[in-house]
Amino acid sequence: MNKKRLASVATSLVISSSALGAELSLLSNLEIEGDARVRGISTSGITSNSDKAKETYDSRIRINLNTTTDSGVKIHSRVVLDNDTWGKTSDKNVEWDEASVLVPLKDFFVYAGRVNDTYGTPFYGSHNDKIDLAFIGYTGIENTLLYGFDYKAVEGAYNSSNGQLGSSTGDGDYDAYGLGGQITIDKLLLGGRYVSLQDNRSDDGGKTFRDTKGFFVDAFASGEIAGLELQAQIQQNGGDKYSGGKKVDLEALGMYLNVAKQFDRLKIGAIAISTEDGYVAGGDLEASYLTSPTNGAIATLGRVGGYGDTVLLSGQVKYDINPELLIEATIASHSIKKATLNSLNKDLEITEYNLGLQYKIAKDVTYKIQYAAASFDQGNLDDIQNAMHSINIKF
């Protein structure tokens, strides 16, 4: 099975070698790689953070360490050094971001550790949030992966959970158990899974536990079909959850379609997104600059669905002027029901325009400039103006 396909399952897997309870020979190889970024951002108008002009610089270095033992066990670790806002000392962080191990067996593999939850496409709500995972995969059928897993969002007194599985409060346990599979047909990857959510956290020091059970069903497609690049994903949540001090129905539905076509140096694409009943898309979803923190827009409009049930439609064009220079443009329409942005609580229409440029200074060095503007159909909201430039280095 193509090892690159395993990455789409959900994960990059990581635990420290000492946690394996055995000595491992790490003499086979040790690879160190990573990336560094310095960027400046200027924002004016209403944003998810404030309604005044803001100029910031930040920097980030990510270092990956990978090794393979003589017996084929793969160990991965990543350290992130963040200086989120220059001049603000409280935003300086050093984090052991990932730590995982992949143990190959005949027709099986075991994958375990602290990983980024990257199931399917970037639309998945917890995309790149941290989970602690134990994952068993079966690869005995050609071009097919079957798997089962258990992951923790909250364990014991550790109360840092991700956005998909709940707020970062409460002590106790929050577990997810699931079964899934995926198959590669020509150039198209198709996958699906069922996940059971069990929330047994306590907000009052152990006097009362939530004892709620929910689930979600997820399916995705990613790859190429009929000459088109395709990403599609749908997730339906059910069962119950804990909100406002009581059990309530867990109902959320998210749908995503991204289609693109390459014409020599020109690429044209279209994206359609729908979120209902509280579904919030992943943070790495690049539907527009103002909904994608990875594009450097300070999450100005936050994740798609974060301000209310949303329908987002966008058209994108990218053109390679030469091997070093790329330009791109996007126009996006956001329709949000009872939008909570700036405590509005009204239906809101947003029209967004994006323009970007990427220039490859050297083989591993890229300079980016991005500009975004957004206008609202509500007169009491100031239009957004957002500009970002950055240096990105791979090593």
Say what each PLM segment does.
Residues N2-D117, A134-T144, I183-L188, G192, ...:
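Beta-barrel outer-membrane channel/assembly domains of diderm bacteria
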Residues G120-P122, E155-Y158, N200-S202, K241-Y242, ...:
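Extracytoplasmic/secreted cell-surface and envelope-processing proteins
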Residues I141-E142, A153-G170, D199-R201, K207-R210, ...:
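Gram-negative and organellar
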Residues L146-I225:
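Internal metal/ion-chelating core segments
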Residues Q198-D199, N237-G239, S274-G278, H334-S335:
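Short, catalytically relevant binding-site loops at active-site mouths
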Residues K247-T291:
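Long, well-ordered mid-to-C-terminal structural blocks that present hydrophobic/aromatic surfaces
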